[in-house]
Amino acid sequence: MIPMPKMIRSLLLLFCLLPLGAQAALEIRITQGVEGAMPIAIVPFGWEGPGARPPEDIGAIIQANLHRSGQFSPMEQGRMPQRPTRGQDVNFQVWRGAGVDYVVIGRLVPAGADRFNVQFQLFDTVRGRQVTGYSIPASSSQLRRAAHMASDIIYQQITGVRGAFNTRVAYVSVTREGGEQRFALQVADADGHNPRTIFRSRQPILSPVWSPDGRRLAYVSFENRNSEIYVQDIDGAQRERIASFQGINSAPAWSPDGRRMALTLSRDGQPDIYVMNLADRSLLRVTNSRSIDTEPEWTPDGRNLLFTSDRAGNPQIYEQSLSGGQPRRLTFDGRYNGNPTLSPDGRLVAMVNGDGGRFRIAVLDRQTRQFRLLTDGRLDEAPSFAPNGSMIIYATAGRGGQGELAAVSADGRVRQSLVLQEGEVREPAWSPFLD
């Protein structure tokens, strides 16, 4: 893999990746959690139907989700003092004595042909009361999603922050077949399960980005030996080329309302930022300079764009109002700052910070101007916020330079590694909320 930041790579239209093995689900490993994480017990869910229970282990999925967040320390099943499936059987004193603050119990109840109700309750053992309880209808193919929905509810009830377990991640993988590389744009659940291929190509795929409604992806494809921007439904039903101008077509970014797209074009000379009206394909030129301007990112109100520019000599991040005026420089820490992505509330800017030959993920608070490095890798790039703003997924160079995905919390306290059993993955993009 070529050790250069994403901005330079994309502008040179290079995309060098090592050959991969077979595609598989991403395995998520917790490498650092919050000190003093919340003690919680997810009691194995009961099965109230005849015969064998469905294969999905609802309780295990919820436990894995909460553990993966880094905010919770789930009790091992072998240490649980009791295994109730009904609220009246929960002994608060016993659980408090075991050092558990919250208990989740539940059951899977048949509700007709291939229909089930995932019923669960969350209890606060300190206060000795039920916090919440839900019944989620699902078919057998939807049980894993129901477990993610339950995880979101539990997470929000305890932390006050909406959970992001029932979301998806898009990424690019590469395989080698018959001595040639094969590129694939894939979408998986946020926990790495259920990977699906959206598009395959013999040529590189770059910069996938989700539409605000979570139904489409925009990305850059080189299938016609030139960079072009496409929009595709995630179910594969429709695919449309929206930018194929002479020169560079790169870095698509949906507006918050989904009606416009910011992109980088070199049709008029140097790479500049443009905004396309997706209804009539009309273009508004946002920047016009002799520098390289790229990697646009919308503010949540749709009024401003952040972008990367080398107009000061080295790549730095700027903010430009769409109503006009001069761009304002935002970053001053390090020789390189690029690939800006905003938290959903618009307060934090995640970016790639380069200094001393290393590229790491950092965040800048737009209100306080506080700058913080979050990662310590050699080549970390392509940050993307979870829709609740709690985590940032990014690409990194793993052992031997192999490309992996990783995630870090916005405060740097929680770290995860997302690894294919064989191969390499790049270009992550976290979906918006899907419900």
From Swiss-Prot:
Domain of life per record: Bacteria
Signal peptide: 1-24
InterPro entries, A to Z: 6-blade_b-propeller_TolB-like, PD40, Tol-Pal_TolB, TolB_N
Chief localisation class: periplasm
UniProt key word Transferase: no
GO annotation terms (biological process): cell division; protein import
Alphabetically ordered keywords of this record: Cell cycle, Cell division, Periplasm, Signal
Compartments it resides in: Periplasm
Keyword hit for Cell division: yes
Gene Ontology cellular component annotations, sorted alphabetically: periplasmic space
Family: Belongs to the TolB family.
Known partners and oligomeric status: The Tol-Pal system is composed of five core proteins: the inner membrane proteins TolA, TolQ and TolR, the periplasmic protein TolB and the outer membrane protein Pal. They form a network linking the inner and outer membranes and the peptidoglycan layer.
NCBIfam families for the chain: propeller_TolB
Function recorded in the entry: Part of the Tol-Pal system, which plays a role in outer membrane invagination during cell division and is important for maintaining outer membrane integrity.
Protein name: Tol-Pal system protein TolB
Organism of this sequence: Thioalkalivibrio sulfidiphilus (strain HL-EbGR7)
Primary gene name: tolB
